[in-house]
Amino acid sequence: MINKVLLEGQRITRSPQVKQHACGASFFLVVLLLIGGLLYSTISWMWDEQRLPLSKLVLQGDLHYVSALDVQRVLARLDHIGTFMSQDINVLQESVQSIPWVSHASIRKQWPDTIKVYLTEYQVEALWNANALLDKNGTVFYGDIARVNGEYVKLYGPDGTAPQVLKAWRDYNPKFAQLGLNISSLVLNDRRAWQIILDNGIRLELGKESLEERISRFFLLYKQLGNKAEQVSYIDLRYDTGAAVGWFPEQELTQEKNDD
């Protein structure tokens, strides 16, 4: 009997504490539900493409050939541009990277509706196969040649040989410059034979091998030609020794002088 009374007393003593815990748990649950609802509403609002579309473009970089209009045009080809939350940056970057003059594109989103684009352009080093351009690494790109400012050497070669031809021009042109000449065109044909056209119009046939020796042979011959060099059409150096010299016809030379 005493035990029963004691137990009942304990229950009576604890009941306010139990109620307090129950109220606290209920309040905490309500707060969680409110926070969850608010978070869900916020995320849904941020992902709603009608509310926060990426609609502004900021273009940065030292640019001479790429404009904001170029970037807008390639982005307009996408099915759609999402929101700050939903848009995949890689998709934007791949699209902008397709612009012919763009060497590298770095893109990030800025809250709430802005796309920031930083571009690095290719730097022209040479013309390639009459319809493309090369950068300093021998990378081929297809920028609009008509927009290129300045004079550049014309390089030609089979697919995949651009770095090799560019290196050859860099190696040999300084040697010609010592005689006051410059390489205007450098050609590596399909048979892997080399041809040089100088800025004074002389064409050099060098063949496939012994380029250093054949070019050195040309230098000796050119010094011997003196003033007669302007009468030379081509020099064929594809021999073990010596060279074959092709001369302009006398009539053609006379016509050129009259034109001057």
From Swiss-Prot:
Residues 48-260 are periplasmic. The keyword Membrane applies. Gene3D superfamilies: Cell division protein FtsQ/DivIB, membrane protein fhac. It holds the Pfam family FtsQ_DivIB_C. Residues 1-26 are cytoplasmic. GO terms for cellular component: cell division site; FtsQBL complex; plasma membrane. PROSITE patterns: POTRA. It is found in: Cell inner membrane. The chain crosses the membrane at residues 27-47. Keywords: Cell cycle, Cell division, Cell inner membrane, Cell membrane, Membrane, Transmembrane, Transmembrane helix. Essential cell division protein. May link together the upstream cell division proteins, which are predominantly cytoplasmic, with the downstream cell division proteins, which are predominantly periplasmic. May control correct divisome assembly. Part of a complex composed of FtsB, FtsL and FtsQ. This is Cell division protein FtsQ. It comes from Vibrio cholerae serotype O1 (strain ATCC 39315 / El Tor Inaba N16961).
